[in-house]
């Protein structure tokens, strides 16, 4: 993993598909003096993603790609390399990256997932945790590999499931923890 050296921060791209609440949290984290990252690029597969507004607010370059085929992915790879990106953080990015893409940035792609992996990979994590009467759910930051939500776990945070929880209110409580966990996981990942 690329390490930040002294005052030199790791150039980072954030991939989003929707609201960008983790993006906003990571931007705030990157502005801290002791943060090891600088966010140089926001990439989305959705031109209507609400999170793209942070590009204007924080003056960060944004690019939209459809990720529909290998040609599109090559354009993304070129954009990342042209911007000297050394860390990619997936933050609510709802596309599965190809093995070829992942191999281009092996060990440099992180993802945040709203469950305690390896439980509940994929979608509808909160519904499944409640349906199965789990006592805890939570969130996980992991390295991305070619298998869905299966990369090496960096950090996790447990959140107790309350008796009257709905998927929506459990998701809100987990999201609060995601905003704390992702920055800590980035620091840990960069030190590995």
State each model region's role.
Residues 1-192:
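One-carbon transfer enzymes
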């Amino acid at each position: 993993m690329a390490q930040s050296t002294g005052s030199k921060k790791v150039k980072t791209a954030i991939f989003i598909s929707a609201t960008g609440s983790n993006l906003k949290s990571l931007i705030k984290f990157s502005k801290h003096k002791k943060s090891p990252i600088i966010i140089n690029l926001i990439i989305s597969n959705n031109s209507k993603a609400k999170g793209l507004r942070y590009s204007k607010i924080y003056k960060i370059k944004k690019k939209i790609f459809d990720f529909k085929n290998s040609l599109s992915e090559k354009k993304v790879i070129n954009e990342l390399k042209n911007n000297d990106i050394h860390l990619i953080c997936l933050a609510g990015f709802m596309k599965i990256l190809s093995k070829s893409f992942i191999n281009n940035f092996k060990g440099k792609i992180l993802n945040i997932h709203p469950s305690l992996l390896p439980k509940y990979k994929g979608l509808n994590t909160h519904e499944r945790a409640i349906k199965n009467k789990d006592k805890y759910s939570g969130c996980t930051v992991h390295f991305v590999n070619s298998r869905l939500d299966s990369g090496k776990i960096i950090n996790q945070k447990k959140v107790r499931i309350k008796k009257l929880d709905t998927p929506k209110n459990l998701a809100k409580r987990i999201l609060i923890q995601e905003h704390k966990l992702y920055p800590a996981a980035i620091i840990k990942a960069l030190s590995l």
